[in-house]
Amino acid sequence: MEPTINPPVNLPPPVPSRSNLSLNYSNNNTNNTNNTNNTNDFKKKLQFQLQSSPSSPSSPSPSIIYKKTPAVNNNNNNNNNNNHINNGNVNGIGPGGGNSYISSPQSSPIHTSSNGISYTVTTNSPPLLPVDNSSGYNNNLNSTFVETLSSSSPSPIKTTTTPPPPVPSKSKSKSSEKLSVKLLKSNSKPSLNDLYQQQQQQSNPNSPTTPPSNCNIESIQPPSSSSSSTTPSTSPQLPAIYSKYSKISLPQLPLPPFLPPSPLVQSTSSPSFSSLILPLPSSPLPPPPLTIPNKVPPLPMRLPPPPPPQQLDQMYSNNNQQQQQQQQQQQNNESNSTTTSEGGLTPESESKLYEIASQPPSTPRLTHESKVIPSEIELLIKFYPSPSLSSGSLLTIPSTIEKSFIFSPCSTVDEILSIIIPNFQFHNGLKCFAKHTFNNEWEATHNDPAAASSSIIDDHESFALFNQKSPTIPLHKEKTILELSLHDRDVLILKTVSLVFTLVKVQIPHFTENSLSATATVKFNQFTSIRSIIRKLYLKYHNNVDISRHGIFLINDNNNNNNNNNNNNNNNNNNNNNNNNNNNNNNNNNNNNNNNNNNNNNNNNNNNNNLHQQQDELSSSIQLEEEELFSTYNINSNSNLVFRTISNQENDILNSSQKILNLKILISSTFSRNNTLNLMFDPRDSVSKAIKVTGLRTGLLDSLNKCGFYLTPSEDDDEGFWMDEELTLEMYNLKNHTFLSFKERCKKYTILIKMGGASNGNGNGDLTWRKCTFKFDQFTKVSTLFNILINNENIKNPKDYHLVVKSTGTSLEKHRYLWSYDIKSPYEIEFKEYPNKLLIFNPQNGEKNFVYVDFNEPIKDVCARLSQTFSSPIDFGSISTNNNNNNNNNNNINSNSNGSSGAGGANSNALTSSTNSASTTSSSTPTTPELPPQVNHVRERSYTFKRLGQLNNTIDSRKSLKDQGVLPNDALMLEVIQDDSIATNNNNNNNNNNSNTTTTIKDKKINRNSLPSSTTMVFEDLVKDGTILSEERQINIWDEPADSNGNIIYSKTVTNNLNAEIDAATLNKLIIRLTNPVFHDLTFMKTFLMTYSSYTTTTTLLKKLFERFQVPTHIDERERLSAQLRVANVIKYWVEHHYEDFCHESTKLMVDFVDTHMMIAFPTLGVQIRNCILKRTCGFKSELVRTRSNGALTSPRTNLSLSFTNLNNSSVGSIANTSSSTSTSSTSSLLSSTNSISISSSLSLSFNSGINSPSISQNTPSSPSLIPSSPRPITSSSSVSSSTLLKSPLSQQAKSRIPETKTKGFANPRNLFDFDDEEIARQLTLYDFQLYTAIKPTEFLNQAWNKPSMASRKSPTILKIISRFNDISLWVVSLILEPDRVKTRAKRLKRIISIADELRKLNNYNTCIAVISGINNSAILRLKYTRGLLSKKYLDILENLEKEMSCEGSYKNYRDKLKNSDPPVVPYIGVYLTDLTFIEEGNPNIIRGNLINFAKYYLIYRVISEIQQYQWTEYQLNVAPIIQTFIRDVSISSTSDDLYHLSLLKEPRNALKSDIF
């Protein structure tokens, strides 16, 4: 009768010594008798093969189909060509260690016979399949069971070939090929002793095997061959210790790697039982060569030594759990299975298994993502006055306050209190003297200072927040809203509670290197946290104490008292023994020796007692959790606290529990080198707790609620995610020595709220600044912060408020992210009202300006700032408060009167000029604003406003404009406040008639515009080396003598040649050539009108043209008309192409001349010129207004950068068709019409000096105006300037040529590198082209950009381009140095090189060279490890860029590249500035004393004309506003030295590769 076969269990195998491991193999030619082994041994081997090779989606392993067939006896004369295998193979099927291989022909079954039972292995797979041990499991599982051989002679196995049974497949894909294992199933679990008893039984090979009753056995067709006889084998009895743990899998031992694999012999197959089907690997490993030794000694039979009982208990419990799970899974499988076919799974189960197997392996990057922190949370705050305070003088409140606030979820409770309490004081009438103490408490103090000083230490009231759900427990003030799990619309109660202070001593052992201890006295209350005390101890003792492993411990006093008593008793015994020894010393030496021995024993006892005392102290001490409060542990003044390191014994206890996670924390900081700190955590700890522990251990005490853990699966900062603070560390499957970046996740912004007109905490209505703090992550926009402030401050008109960076004055745009602004610590932002516009008149020159002022500031402060912003300075002697100053046409104006701050005083050089009555009617040209020099004895002037049309000034300069009732856009006049002595002196200076005018000036040129052409004037101009031109008597242009070497020099030797170029000539000769009636030289006219401002003024040129127009009567009529027509055409071209040259005075002269002369001679041409003037002044410039104020003509300033709105044709046509006359009234009507049109146009003023705040546009007040002035004539077809490219609609044909915008990263961008490189280059090009087209030709003259005194006034756009070029260069350096890891820096460098290459393709050479300049900065060039990670592709791109943009040979390669580039182009502005500098410095302005070097201006014109030709063709690109927000303001506060220092921190000098990577 054949014994019953029970399913295998985890049998503890006999484990031989590693040195004696061996296997017995036989040669293929040997015919030995098969010594069969026990069936259960082989089944155990197969069962373990299944258990040691689990199939999972992450590591699929092959499956095997074992089919059970009756075995036949094999004779010893079996000489067929069969392979022999020892039935004692290791690891179930084939030896070989970690991976065993099954070698068989494809689609052929393998039969193995043992003890009368035949096992058929059927494969539908390639010849060799690895038995893979999946990751996460022990690789030494193959050594669990070692086959024990009873005989060294293997048995031959017959090989037959049968077709494999059909295997159910899911689809035709390769993954449907499976390898199945079919075994008997049994729910009964035999004991270990039963299994060993079965090994001793003799198997009957002729009888069929009886399966268990619960197994569904199909009919089996026995093969024709006979089975071999078997020999019983013996097994030793198990030790007694295994009786309890009969179902435990013992630890496995690894097998030696030298054991070769063994082939399996094929046999016939039979019908199968129920099977488990698992997927095959896609690509099997190639078969290794088989080497079978001739003689291998058999393995000895040994049992492993019994493991400790503690480990056995743990293993036993684990094994029971596994068995229960397996039984539950089997029951589920049996209940789910409906039908079986050939032992396979149902189609539904197979489909499910296929889906699981096809899933990719799970990684932290796929399973975890950064948790989105909500940007805001709304909470309802209720305040109830405390009964103890409401009756006294400490707190006064009308009623209970209930208000809804919006907070940042990252803010702590203490920061919430800093928002609520001042808000209640300011808006809700909460009148109390609450102060924020150094202990982060909001204490309410007494109104009476005497009462406050006499109060005891416990007499303190503090504000605290309580959750309405638990009103008796105050909220932890150091925890954030996220940590407290608060939700929207939750109710918090604000109360005042009495503070109870406690003083306790904290012992600090081993305070210094000499192991001296110290004692610190700590003061705390019921709200004080353990962490705050550790922070204070660190700040005080960080030089003496290593805080990285420190904590506060509470010592149990009871155990200490017992230890002390024991020590005292031992000491008394020792003293007694010592006395006895001394007394008996002279009597008996033997007694002395005995006593000494006793003393030694006592001393040893004392030492042991001390050790026990330390151990008891460690065991009795409790480490105080840093998250908790002192009140949680009931700490009082008698508590014994110790501030010490965590002992080694505690570490050993933690390590023995196997619950320690050792992590490497990478500390990231902006201006410090990254440090790595090894910390140990309990995997069950929350991420929030680990973050705060890290903050304390690293000393970054202010970063506890701002930093977080950033986990990167790779070494790239940009591909990681933030760990969720609510989860535990073990949920992330972290391994030991995993790198975590500890860096800033939230930035703490301090908001300064500037509000006036309300009652503050002090009871008055003065303007106050209140501070509140918010924390925001990188995904928070400015609009979120703005809406929070609007809600909390109860603002009804949010359009009147904005946010401004305090340090730079930059206005924050609402659609941008807060982190996109480079706001430096302490991250202060001002929340205040928009400064409103005010129309200011300058009574000296009639200048009128729309300026932005703060209506809440005192008027004297506003006036003091505005007095320095006008284009022409206020004449401090001419502005008077008396109305009797203008009685006569010719007044005596003494600019050096006593008491005034005139220009120079006694030390100034006076230059006196006599003028006739006509000279007093003309106004001076606006000059650079300069404050008069201050003299010690001269009183500084102060100013105020005065309403127009009022005789007496009713405005109080000490109050604000809002308090005076001044409304926005009101017109006021700036007036000087003078004392009585000044007024009296001014009255005495205005009583003489027909007196000479004396003007005292200092470093000021004589204004040639105020003198007629027939008078003698001082002609000054700065030339090379600062010399001044000699005086010249200017004569009428019709009186200019004939050509001679004294007034004209031609480029050729032939004189009077009309076509010859002029090298030098007088001004009259140049104008004669300009208006030559015989021929027209267009190049000469362009050169002259572009460069005339270098040697004359607009007013002088106008007067000379007027002289040329007034032809003498003796000239022929035809010649007269030709000359006049040529003058009219020159004026028309001048107005059309150089309208920015005309100021108020020159425009007035032009209008008067057109109305009085040109409308008579050429009416049609006169109307065209008037229309050009209107088109250029209306909408492009501010309005021209003729208003009488103290007899002066008022007008707006002229050097303004304005955004314009084009006039409609009907308005222009109506003005052009108005009747003209020669009277002054017609001029007034023209100016009035101009005013009426321009009032409706939108103005955006940007002053060149004075006010520090940026220019504010009416539509987008936060963005600076970058609207360039187009050099194109307004009548041309391309009249739309390049600045309107972002605004003007394009035609369908133009839209079709615009490339599609690449929207990568538009959804939720964190930084600039979230966008596509090509799209970044496009947006940079659009912005730079906008700046480039704004350059005026006159900005390149006289090297104005290089002269600080006139640069901001003469060349403002060039300065902007130069500043942006330098900003981009430093910006690139900061972008590369920003990442902490070297691989991320290399990635940033690759992206920047790619952007530079795209800029070159777009012909944006200016920004391309700026980027290359940043890459070649010394702070980047020294980063050898960063550059070493660049691939050859990017190195070649960078090399080509550097070669093309090299400055060698005066930028020869770049000039060739630019010449061959098709527009649109943004050229490198530095090359043009260099060329102009060489021209200016290498050629004088004046030669031969009074001849203008016109050949020099030919060269200048050629350079400027080349610049202008690239301003005409515009880029056809779409604007991406979200990218523009990142590239608009690239200025950083760090200097080159700061960036170089940061580079040294990132990669120190002589740093090793291991230190960087």
Swiss-Prot record:
Query: Which residue intervals are annotated with compositional bias (Low complexity) in the record?
Result: 17-40, 52-63, 73-90, 102-114, 148-161, 195-207, 222-236, 311-333, 558-610, 881-928, 1261-1291
Q: Does the keyword Coiled coil apply?
A: yes
Q: Which UniProt keywords apply?
A: Coiled coil, Guanine-nucleotide releasing factor
Q: Which GO terms describe its cellular component?
A: plasma membrane
Identify the domain of life. Eukaryota
Biological-process GO terms, alphabetical: Ras protein signal transduction
UniProt xrefs under InterPro entries: Ras-like_GEF, Ras-like_Gua-exchang_fac_N, Ras_G-nucl-exch_fac_CS, Ras_GEF_dom_sf, RASGEF_cat_dom, RASGEF_cat_dom_sf
| Segments of skewed composition (Polar residues) | 334-343
Query: In its UniProt entry, what is this protein called?
Result: Ras guanine nucleotide exchange factor K
Species this protein is from = Dictyostelium discoideum (Social amoeba)
Q: What is the lineage of its organism?
A: Eukaryota, Amoebozoa, Evosea, Eumycetozoa, Dictyostelia
